[in-house]
Amino acid sequence: MSTVIRRSLAARQLWSWNGFCQWITSTENRLYIGWFGVLMIPTLLAAAFCFVIAFIAAPPVDVDGIREPVIGSLIGGNNLISAAVVPTSAAIGLHFYPIWEAASLDEWLYNGGPYQLIVLHFLIGVWCYLGRQWELSYRLGMRPWIAVAFSAPAAAATAVLLVYPIGQGSFSEGLPLGIAGTFYFMLAFQAEHNILMHPASWLGVAGVFGGALLASLHGSLVISSLIRETSEEESQNAGYRFGQEEVTYNFLAGHYAFLGRLGFPGLGLRNSRSVHFWMAALPTVGIWAAAIGIGIMAFNLNGLNFNQSILDSQGRFIPTYADLLNRANLGIQVMHAPNAHHFPLLLAAQP
């Protein structure tokens, strides 16, 4: 009798586990969960809840570790533009700083513990979302290029939130989680590393702008060459049926005939796959390059930067816009310096 009961319990447990696995990996669900989603959902929820609470009500954070806390919350007097989740204090450095490592909750908040909690959970969730894209593509028999394209923004987020703080030795150097904080990070990064004069930045700008140009160009050509399936009194959009096998626009009329006649005939592509490939490849490679540039700068490898002034054959200085940029960097460095003293050090040391 006991043997029969044990077998029935084992079969029930096996059935429940198999049912759970089938539900997790089922492509018939309204939202695909997947095994990566099992980790993605709780981590992103934790990051989102902590971000909202910290953005609204976090106390001041001693981000520079010099007992001069910075207020970043809405309750502290900021608006939606200036508010941000302030990075973890420089006094913590790169140490893992969960709540139980602090002596009290007030100390954890004062040292910027929520920033580390948000960033680490968010990055885990982002990379799990990438894995979820690959997993769903695999189960549907699709190729994995959707996940490859998403790896660009995932790499960019990892670069500014994790790689750069690791290279600089402190989470206090990470990107503040806010609108004004983002621009603050950009200015400070430019002042310290002159990223605008680095080839990786040029590739990033070219890729993002090139992808935006192709997207607007292709979208406008598609809208302009829709195949009418309705009368003149009805909208052309009403002629589309979800899942229809017929094409909705004339690709050759838009790209080859129209675009080819506006410029060089070679600009008019005849293959829609080539257009969509470049629309995906340009921004993806560009953002990859930008993320690589931030990773290089994180460890102060500035050898590819154009920081030197141009001299003629007689050694005389030739002013360029690069020199203006270098001077601007020096000014931003002075403004960015924490607790800056504008007196000479020897004079300040006099009794």
UniProtKB/Swiss-Prot annotation:
Residue positions annotated to bind a quinone are: H218, F264
What is this protein's record name? Photosystem II protein D1 1
TM segments?
32-49, 121-136, 145-159, 200-221, 278-292
> Would you tell me the Gene Ontology cellular component terms?
photosystem II; plasma membrane-derived thylakoid membrane
* Cleavage (site feature) positions: A348, A349
Query: For this protein, what does the record note about how its cofactor is bound?
Result: The D1/D2 heterodimer binds P680, chlorophylls that are the primary electron donor of PSII, and subsequent electron acceptors. It shares a non-heme iron and each subunit binds pheophytin, quinone, additional chlorophylls, carotenoids and lipids. D1 provides most of the ligands for the Mn4-Ca-O5 cluster of the oxygen-evolving complex (OEC). There is also a Cl(-1) ion associated with D1 and D2, which is required for oxygen evolution. The PSII complex binds additional chlorophylls, carotenoids and specific lipids.
Q: Which residues bind chlorophyll a?
A: H121
